[in-house]
Structure formats: structure tokens, C-alpha cells
Regions:
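N-terminal core-binding DNA-recognition domain of tyrosine site-specific recombinases/integrases
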Residues: 1-19, 35, 165-171, 186-192
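Basic, Lys/Arg- and aromatic-enriched nucleic-acid-binding interface segment
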Residues: 1-3, 16-80, 85-86, 117-119, ...
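Proline-centered turn/helix-capping motifs that create local helix->coil transitions or kinks
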Residues: 14-24, 85, 94-101, 134-148, ...
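Catalytic-site neighborhood detector that most strongly recognizes the C-terminal catalytic loop/helix
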Residues: 32, 40, 96-98, 129, ...
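C-terminal catalytic core of Y-nucleophile DNA break-rejoin enzymes
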Residues: 50, 89-91, 100-101, 110-134, ...
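Short, basic (Lys/Arg/His-rich) helix/loop patches that form interaction surfaces
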Residues: 51, 55-58, 68, 122, ...
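Short, polar N-cap/turn motifs at the start of nucleic acid-interacting alpha helices
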Residues: 82-89, 186-187, 206-226, 236
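C-terminal secondary-structure termini that scaffold catalytic or DNA-interacting sites
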Residues: 87, 98-100, 104-119, 126-128, ...
Length: 276
């Protein structure tokens, strides 16, 4: 779909500027979008995943993405100035992505989130306060040990290695699914941690509107379209509320003998062949 759209727009511009006589892409049907089904981990599977990545470079990115539902670029875009240890907040305001530009793979940094709603401040719960504190202390120690060998170009970023090199987005995309598959986990993408976060929030009774704000979706329809089908628990609650609020007739012999009602409101003998 993406390639078709790019070619279509390029030829549209070329035709507008008289570079080509017609847009031949108009004669090609737009490819159908594949209905991708994300993988949703339940709480038990999530605990197993945490054990699988424990002690690896994947551990903290996985924990952050699973708990906060962050996108890959939001995880790797975290800097220390976004973490307020005193106030206990985590602000999502940067992204780091990877794309091919002029045939070369390049890192793209943006000091703004994907959309205005993506810019959000979330609570820094106790466990994550400890995680980040330990990482920050380790970085300071690495700077002293490495000296001039330390790469200060990415100083301030949370996810760097012992030499200060920043973790690449494609590292998470490529190595995460391969590594966890070797350890018996279901086939899934790194982005599915975000989906799993939403499904766990739903399972614990968090309304879709609050999930929208937690994930940073630009509008409610985005959240509803992706996750509403998981929200069966709320439908059960609605049905129970209706049962309590509405006195339904007893089901004794229900439907065994229906009487006809005329337009004048009179009741007649039941029609054994109603014709519907």
C-alpha cells in the first residue's frame, strides 16, 4: 500500500508538471491492506517474558514498553531530562527512529512526540525509579572508567551501552522477536508490548478513554478501533447492570404459547401458522 501511494503521488506530480502524459498508477488497483493480528500477552505470559529478558540489554526497554505502552521510538528517545526523580514523573517528548535516506540507513531524532497527544507525562512508579537510578549510576561509572573512549555524542540518552553508543531502533525490531522465540515465547513484535499493555489495562477495568491518554493516541476512535474488541468484560458488566435495573419476565414456558394482538388491541387465540 505504501509503495503504491508513493508511486501514485510521484506520477501525479509528474503529470501536473507535464513530465509524463498520464498517471499510469491510476489504472492499478490499490493493494488491499493485510489485516495484521497483534499478539497480546496476558499477565502470566508477561511475567515469563520478563524472566526471559532478565539481565540482557533488552530488559529495561521491554519493561518500559510493556508497563507504559510506549512506542519503540518513544522508548529510545528517553533522556534523563524527561525523568523527574523528585516529582516522580516520566515525560514522553522525544522520539528516535531509523529510516533509509538516499540509500543510507540513518537515525532520526525528533524533540517532539508523534502528535500533540503523544506528548504526555506519566507517573514514575517506585520500581522504575529504582531501575532508572541504577542505569544512571552505571552510566556515570562507565564515563569514568572509559575516559576518552566514551562516546559523549549521545550523552543524556537513557539507552546507551557501556561505551556511550546509543541503542539503535532496529536492534529492538530485529533482535527482540528472535531472542524471545528461542526461549519459548509466542511470536511477537516489540510493538506488541504496547498492545499487550492496553489489553492488560482493559482486563483490569481501565476505561478506553483513560487508555487513550495513557498510550498517547490522538483521538478516541484510534483506541476504540484497535482495542474495543478486547473489552468484553465491560459488556458483561453492562449486561449485569441491565439485569439489575430491569425486571425481566420469568422464563417459565416462555414462547410455548403466544397470543395474537390485533390492531384494536384485542387478544385472540394464537395463530398456529403465523407466517413469519
Amino acid at each position: 500500500i505504501h509503495y503504491h501511494a508513493v508511486i501514485y503521488q510521484a506520477l501525479k506530480y509528474a503529470m501536473k508538471t507535464d513530465m509524463v502524459p498520464q498517471n499510469v498508477a491510476m489504472k492499478v488497483d490499490r493493494p488491499r491492506k493485510n489485516s495484521f493480528q497483534p499478539t497480546f500477552l496476558d499477565a502470566e505470559q508477561m511475567q515469563k517474558l520478563f524472566e526471559v529478558v532478565k539481565g540482557t540489554r533488552l530488559e529495561l526497554p521491554v519493561l518500559v514498553a510493556a508497563f507504559y505502552g510506549l512506542r519503540r521510538g518513544e522508548v529510545l528517545g528517553l533522556k534523563w531530562d524527561a525523568i523527574d526523580f523528585n516529582r516522580g514523573t516520566l515525560t514522553i517528548k522525544r522520539t528516535v527512529t531509523e529510516a533509509t535516506i538516499d540509500g543510507t540507513m540513518k537515525i532520526i531524532e525528533q524533540d517532539s512526540a508523534k502528535t500533540k497527544s503523544s506528548l504526555r507525562t506519566l507517573p514514575l512508579v517506585g520500581s522504575f525509579r529504582d531501575y532508572f537510578q541504577k542505569v544512571k549510576e552505571a552510566q556515570e561509572l562507565n564515563k569514568k572508567v572509559c575516559g576518552n573512549c566514551y562516546n559523549y555524542e549521545y550523552d543524556g540518552y537513557v539507552f546507551v551501552n557501556e561505551l556511550g553508543e546509543r541503542m539503535r531502533p532496529n536492534y529492538l525490531t530485529e533482535y527482540f522477536p528472535k531472542y524471545i522465540a528461542k526461549h519459548g515465547m509466542p511470536k511477537m513484535r516489540f510493538h506488541d508490548l504496547r498492545h499487550s499493555c492496553a489489553s492488560l489495562l482493559l482486563a483490569n477495568g481501565v476505561p478506553l478513554k483513560q487508555i487513550q491518554e495513557w498510550l498517547g493516541h490522538s483521538d478516541f476512535s484510534t483506541t476504540a478501533n484497535i482495542y474495543a474488541h478486547l473489552d468484553y468484560r465491560s459488556k458483561i458488566s453492562s449486561a449485569q447492570a441491565m439485569e439489575q435495573g430491569m425486571l425481566l419476565p420469568r422464563s417459565d414456558d416462555f414462547g410455548s404459547r403466544w397470543e395474537n394482538v390485533t390492531e384494536q388491541g384485542k387478544i385472540t387465540e394464537p395463530d398456529l401458522n403465523p407466517g413469519f
